[in-house]
Design a protein with these regions (language model features):
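Conserved ATP-binding loop and adjacent catalytic segment of the adenylate-forming AMP-binding
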Residues: 1-3, 11-21, 30-35, 47-50, ...
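AMP-binding/adenylate-forming catalytic core of the ANL superfamily
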Residues: 4, 10, 25, 29-31, ...
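Structured helix-beta-strand junction loops
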Residues: 40, 50-51
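Generic surface-pattern signal
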Residues: 49, 144, 176-177
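Acidic/polar alpha-helix N-cap and adjacent early helical turns
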Residues: 173-185
Length: 185
C-alpha cells in the first residue's frame, strides 16, 4: 500500500542503506494515506513535496533492510559537522540510576559561528546528589566524543504538554541559564 524510503532532506534523492536521511512515505493509491492536516493547508503543503509525505523523522535502512528510527529531524543537533540524535544522548543519561528524565537539545555555540552545542536538561531522583563530572564520564562510554554535552542543567520540572511530552523548544528558548554547568573535562 505504501512506498517507504529514506531520502536526502534537501534534494529528496533516495539514499543508500546505512545513510541517515528523512523517512518519506508515498501511498500507492491516491489519498491512501491522508488528504492533509485538518484545517492546516500550509502544513499539508509543506509535508507533501515531490509526491512524498515528509514525516519529519530521521532514519536509515540497515543491512537487513529494516527501517531504523534515529530522531525527529527538528530534535537532531548539528555539531562540528556531525548530526547527533537527541534520543541517543538522552538514553545514555537515562542509564545513570540517579537520573529520572533527560532532554537533549541544541544551544548556539558562542565561539563556533553557526554551529550548535549539546545541552542536556536533567531531572534527578529525589535525594540524589548532583554529580555532573561523574555523569559525563559515564555517558562518555556510550557516546561519540562530538556528542558529549558541553552543558548540563538539573531542573525540578520540565515544561510538558498535556500528554506528558517534554516541550523541547521551551528548553531551547531558555537556553543556558545561571544554574547551567559547563563541561570542562
Amino acid at each position: 500500500y505504501f512506498d517507504v524510503e529514506v531520502r536526502d532532506t534537501n534534494t529528496d534523492e533516495k539514499l543508500k542503506n546505512g545513510a541517515v536521511g528523512e523517512i518519506m512515505v508515498r501511498p500507492k493509491i491516491s489519498f491512501g494515506f491522508m488528504q492533509g492536516y485538518l484545517g492546516m493547508p500550509d502544513k499539508s503543503f509543506e509535508a507533501y513535496r515531490n509526491f512524498w509525505f515528509h514525516t519529519g523523522d530521521a532514519g536509515f535502512f540497515n543491512k537487513k533492510n529494516q527501517l531504523i528510527f534515529v530522531d525527529r529531524i527538528k530534535d537532531c543537533i548539528r555539531r562540528r559537522g556531525e548530526n547527533i540524535s537527541s534520543y541517543e544522548v538522552e538514553q545514555a543519561f537515562l542509564k545513570i540510576p540517579q537520573i529520572a528524565e533527560a532532554a537533549a537539545f541544541a544551544v548556539p555555540a558562542k565561539d563556533h559561528g553557526q554551529e550548535d552545542e549539546v545541552m542536556v536538561a536533567l531531572m534527578i531522583i529525589k535525594g540524589s546528589k548532583i554529580e555532573y563530572s561523574e555523569w559525563i564520564n559515564k555517558v562518555s562510554a556510550d557516546l561519540a566524543k562530538f556528542a558529549i554535552p558541553l552543558y548540563l542543567r538539573v531542573m525540578k520540572n520540565f515544561p510538558k504538554t498535556q500528554t506528558g511530552k517534554i516541550i523541547k523548544h521551551a528548553l531551547r528558548t531558555e537556553g543556558i541559564t545561571n544554574d547551567t554547568w559547563k563541561n570542562n573535562l
